[in-house]
Amino acid sequence: GILDAIKAIAKAAG
């Protein structure tokens, strides 16, 4: 879902 995409991006940015 959209939240999963946000979490994935946040993890990649971290």
From Swiss-Prot:
GO terms for biological process: defense response to bacterium; defense response to fungus; killing of cells of another organism. Disulfide bonds: none annotated. GO terms for cellular component: extracellular region. Expressed by the skin glands. Keywords: Amidation, Amphibian defense peptide, Antibiotic, Antimicrobial, Fungicide, Secreted. It comes from the Eukaryota. Has antibacterial activity against the Gram-positive bacterium S.aureus, and the Gram-negative bacteria P.aeruginosa and E.coli. Has antifungal activity against C.albicans. No hemolytic activity has been detected. This is Hylaseptin-P1. It comes from Boana punctata (Polka-dot tree frog).
